[in-house]
């Protein structure tokens, strides 16, 4: 023998259905990862949008390249530099590379010796590089050449290339 549902059960079920209808369903993150974005980010005054389609052009501005085999490449605008320097613009290029190509890159573009990267003391002055979050970077070495600041994390793998400019 079955009994019809009581009014209390029906009311509770109706309330649960209404609450579920008012609660947004979980969604995927609304912001795509920088390498997935289809809309380039154009910083005022910058010669190119901060996107992978313009990577070679951006690297040419700094008269540099990335280490051979670099992967997981992202480009973001250097907005903190732009805020602190009237008319300034810049790009932060983040990437991963194997140790030997990083050493070769250091040898080619800086005064440091790539073979000695592990023996250099950790860089501790980050005041001039506000567009890179150093809180999760272990044992950084910072070096510069021209318009470029290069941050290398040890053990070798993660790197950041900051290219900045301004009107003349």
PLM regions and their residue ranges:
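Bacterial N-terminal signal peptides that target proteins for export
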Residues: 1-10
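Juxtamembrane and targeting peptides
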Residues: 16, 27-28
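C-terminal motif of bacterial Sec signal peptides marking the signal peptidase cleavage site
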Residues: 18-21
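Bacterial signal peptide processing site
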Residues: 23-25
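Extracytoplasmic low-complexity, Pro/Thr/Ser/Ala/Gly-rich segments
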Residues: 29-87, 91
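A short, structured loop/turn motif at beta-sheet edges
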Residues: 64-69, 98-102, 155-156
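Terminal, regulation- and interaction-focused segments at domain boundaries
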Residues: 80-108
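Extracytosolic low-complexity repeat regions of secreted or lipid-anchored proteins
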Residues: 92, 102-166
